[in-house]
């Protein structure tokens, strides 16, 4: 059995949203991601887990070409969204990031009003013809971000004035305002308290009804709670990928078991 046969365990059949093949990432001479092959299922939460420095965030950034913004980064391989190569020279990275949104580790609302934070992307992409349409887009995104009821009477207030948990939900609303197909989340709860974390986790479960969600997390408990599929990265390699319950209860690779049981990390 070759390495890919071990990684590509049988998983529940679901339409593939993104297909990644023979993927490598280099930072200068450093080979950060080594021959990763993975399919991201539609309307599913996929968790990337692994020790610090294992490459999970680097690989996540490949999925919407955020590594393009890092000096010296070089990406090789095939990354397809609905069968289309996202690294094709004809693809506009800005347009791609409207389809593949991202939420970062630390809440980063713009220094604008709550309304303008959410309206920012739709304005850039010309999604509203008038104020009424923009109002509808903003309300829909804030509702899906599970924060509408908390901010509907103060949309002109600065987004930076919200609590940490509210700011992160605002950033999620901002990311989904452009109606993406995939939502990437890089440690979205690491800066939040337990109550705010629970709110975001509940929101993630709701979001998968409409989007493919990929989340990087250092918390194995969080991965087990929110995801249906889990990928374990170690030293730049995808070691194992499969159904979350199977990965956590009966992993095939001893390195996965060692990480889950705390022997490596």
Swiss-Prot record:
Membrane topology recorded in Swiss-Prot or TrEMBL: Peripheral membrane protein
Reaction(s) catalysed by this chain's protein: phosphate(out) + ATP + H2O = ADP + 2 phosphate(in) + H(+)
Alphabetized UniProt keyword annotations: ATP-binding, Cell inner membrane, Cell membrane, Membrane, Nucleotide-binding, Phosphate transport, Translocase, Transport
SUPFAM superfamilies noted in UniProt: P-loop containing nucleoside triphosphate hydrolases
EC number assigned by the record: 7.3.2.1
Enzyme class (EC, first level): translocase
Pfam families: ABC_tran
Cellular component GO terms, alphabetical: plasma membrane
Compartments, record wording: Cell inner membrane
Ligand binding (ATP): 50-57
UniProt keyword Membrane present: yes
One GO term (biological process): phosphate ion transmembrane transport
Subunit: The complex is composed of two ATP-binding proteins (PstB), two transmembrane proteins (PstC and PstA) and a solute-binding protein (PstS).
NCBIfam families reported in the protein's UniProt record: 3a0107s01c2
Known function: Part of the ABC transporter complex PstSACB involved in phosphate import. Responsible for energy coupling to the transport system.
Name this polypeptide is given: Phosphate import ATP-binding protein PstB
Species in which this protein is naturally found: Ruegeria pomeroyi (strain ATCC 700808 / DSM 15171 / DSS-3)
Taxonomic path: Bacteria, Pseudomonadati, Pseudomonadota, Alphaproteobacteria, Rhodobacterales
